[in-house]
C-alpha cells in the first residue's frame, strides 16, 4: 500500500530514505495538486515575505545607507526634489523605522524638567512645516525640531537653492525661510493631535504629557521671521501661535539666507528680542496646552551661528543670561568654505548659502566650547549641532558642554539607520568609560 507523506508523518513511521523520496518527488513545487507542496510553498513564501518586509522597513538594515539613499540621490539630481521626496516618505509612513527602539538607561538625560530617553535630536530644516513628525520620531530620535516657521507664507529664495556636495557629505542651502506660514503649520499640528486623541492607542490622554505625543521625547518648534517682517513682532507672533503646541520654542536669529537676520545676534538687539520673547511666553503660561494642561511654560532657546568671534559669543552668552532664556543651540550653518572641502567643482563650492554637514563640525564644536566657557554655571542648556555623524562626535560635543545634540545633513546622507548607529556607538563608548551621558556633559569645559 502506498502512503502519503502526511499519513506517514501521522503514523510516525517515516524513515530517512522515505523522507528524501517524498521531498524530491511528492512535495515538488511542480506538483501543485499535492496539499503538502502547497502548504510548504505558502509557508516558505509567507516566511520569506515577512523577513523581507522586516528587513526593508527596519532602519538598521544596511541596504538603506548603501542602496536606498544613493538611489534617491541618483533619481533626484535636483537636491530639493530629493528633500521633498524624503519628507513625503516620512509623512506617509513609508520610510524605514527603528524596530524595538528601547534606549539603555545610560542614554537618558534630564533636561528642562523632563527625562529624555536619549539625547539625539533632529535639527530644524528637515521638516519645515510639521508634516512628518511621527515618521522622524520613528527613526529613534529623542527630540525633533520642526521649522523654521514664519508668520506669513513665503516662497523663500529663487531656485535652485539646495546643493549636494556628496564627496564631503555636505550641502549648501539658501532656502531663505521658505515656509507655509503659521496657520498652515498649526493646522498640521492640530490634525496630528486630533488623530492621536481619536486613535485606539490613546486610552488616556493624560498618560502623555509631552506635546511630542511620545513619552520621554520632546517636540521643538523653530521660529523665524518673514523676509520683510518686524524683527521682534514676528517672533512674538510665533510664540503666541505655537506656545500650546511646543515642548520647546526656538528663536532662529542665525540663518545666513535672510537679509539682516544675523544682525539680531548683537548683544543689545538680542537682549531686547529675547527679553520680549520670554515675557510673551510667560504671559501665556495660564493658557495651557492642546493636551489639556492648565499651565504650560515651554523653554525658550536661541539658535546662533558658528561664524562668530569670541567676543561675539561672549556677548550672546550675556544676552541669554540677561533675558533669562533657557538655552542656546550652537550652531546653524556656516557661510565659510573650509579648506578641508574636497569637492572639486569650485562653482558648486562657491554657491551662496549656508554650508552644513561633516565639514561644519570643527567650526560648530569650537563655537560650542567657547559658549560653554562663557555660560558655565549659568544654568543655560547648550545643544550641540553641526557636522555630527557618529557616536564619537556626539560624545565630543557632550564633553564640550552639550546636554543634547542635533543632526540632519549626515542623516540625509547615511540614511535612517544613522540614528540607531549613533546611539549604539555612544552606548559602547560610555560603557567603556563606565559613565552615563549625563555624567560626561561639560566634562572638558574650562
From Swiss-Prot:
Record note on cofactor: Binds 1 FMN per subunit.
GO biological process: 'de novo' pyrimidine nucleobase biosynthetic process; 'de novo' UMP biosynthetic process
Named cofactor requirement(s): FMN
UniProt: substrate binding residues: 128, 173-177, 252-257, 332-333
GO molecular function: dihydroorotate dehydrogenase (quinone) activity
Domain of life: Eukaryota
Pathway assigned in UniProt: Pyrimidine metabolism; UMP biosynthesis via de novo pathway; orotate from (S)-dihydroorotate (quinone route): step 1/1
Transmembrane segments: 42-58
Function in brief: Catalyzes the conversion of dihydroorotate to orotate with quinone as electron acceptor.
PANTHER family, sorted: DIHYDROOROTATE DEHYDROGENASE (QUINONE), MITOCHONDRIAL, DIHYDROOROTATE DEHYDROGENASE (QUINONE), MITOCHONDRIAL-RELATED
Protein name (record): Dihydroorotate dehydrogenase (quinone), mitochondrial
UniProt source species: Kluyveromyces marxianus (Yeast)
Amino acid at each position: 500500500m502506498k502512503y502519503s507523506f502526511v499519513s506517514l508523518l501521522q503514523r510516525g513511521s517515516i524513515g530517512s530514505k522515505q523522507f528524501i523520496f517524498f521531498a524530491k518527488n511528492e512535495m515538488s513545487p511542480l506538483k501543485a495538486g499535492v496539499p503538502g507542496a502547497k502548504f510548504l510553498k505558502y509557508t516558505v513564501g509567507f516566511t520569506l515575505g515577512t523577513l523581507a518586509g522586516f528587513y526593508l522597513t527596519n532602519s538598521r538594515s544596511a541596504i538603506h545607507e548603501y542602496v536606498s539613499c544613493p538611489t534617491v540621490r541618483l533619481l533626484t539630481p535636483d537636491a530639493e526634489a530629493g528633500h521633498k521626496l524624503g519628507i513625503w516618505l516620512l509623512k506617509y509612513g513609508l520610510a524605514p523605522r527603528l524596530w524595538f527602539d528601547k534606549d539603555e538607561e545610560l542614554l537618558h538625560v534630564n533636561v528642562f524638567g523632563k527625562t529624555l530617553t536619549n539625547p539625539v535630536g533632529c535639527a530644524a530644516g528637515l521638516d519645515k512645516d510639521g508634516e512628518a513628525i511621527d515618521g522622524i520620531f520613528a527613526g529613534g530620535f529623542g527630540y525633533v525640531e520642526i521649522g523654521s516657521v514664519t508668520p506669513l507664507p513665503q516662497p523663500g529664495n529663487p531656485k535652485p537653492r539646495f546643493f549636494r556636495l556628496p564627496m564631503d557629505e555636505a550641502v549648501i542651502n539658501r532656502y531663505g525661510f521658505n515656509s507655509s506660514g503659521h496657520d498652515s503649520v498649526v493646522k498640521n499640528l492640530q490634525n496630528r493631535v486630533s488623530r492621536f486623541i481619536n486613535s485606539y492607542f490613546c486610552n488616556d490622554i493624560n498618560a502623555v504629557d509631552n506635546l511630542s505625543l511620545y513619552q520621554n521625547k520632546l517636540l521643538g518648534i523653530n521660529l523665524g521671521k518673514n523676509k520683510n517682517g518686524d524683527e521682534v513682532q514676528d517672533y512674538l507672533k510665533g510664540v503666541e501661535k505655537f506656545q500650546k503646541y511646543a515642548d520647546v520654542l526656538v528663536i532662529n536669529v542665525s540663518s545666513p539666507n535672510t537679509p539682516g537676520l544675523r544682525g539680531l545676534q548683537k548683544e543689545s538687539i538680542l537682549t531686547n528680542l529675547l527679553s520680549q520673547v520670554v515675557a510673551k511666553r510667560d504671559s501665556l503660561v495660564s493658557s495651557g496646552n492642546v493636551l489639556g494642561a492648565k499651565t504650560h511654560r515651554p523653554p525658550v532657546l536661541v539658535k546662533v551661528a558658528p561664524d562668530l568671534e569670541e567676543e561675539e559669543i561672549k556677548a550672546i552668552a550675556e544676552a541669554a543670561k540677561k533675558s533669562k532664556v533657557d538655552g542656546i543651540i550652537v550652531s546653524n550653518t556656516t557661510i565659510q568654505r573650509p579648506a578641508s572641502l574636497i569637492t572639486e567643482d569650485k562653482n558648486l563650492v562657491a554657491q551662496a548659502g549656508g554650508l552644513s554637514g561633516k565639514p561644519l563640525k570643527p567650526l560648530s564644536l569650537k563655537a560650542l566650547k567657547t559658549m560653554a566657557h562663557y555660560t558655565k554655571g549659568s544654568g543655560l542648556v547648550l545643544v550641540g549641532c553641526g557636522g555630527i555623524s557618529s557616536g564619537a562626535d556626539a560624545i565630543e560635543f557632550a564633553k564640550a558642554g552639550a546636554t543634547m545634540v542635533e543632526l540632519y545633513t549626515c542623516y540625509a546622507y547615511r540614511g535612517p539607520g544613522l540614528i540607531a548607529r549613533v546611539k549604539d556607538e555612544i552606548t559602547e563608548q560610555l560603557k567603556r568609560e563606565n559613565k552615563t551621558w549625563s555624567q560626561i556633559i561639560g566634562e572638558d569645559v574650562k
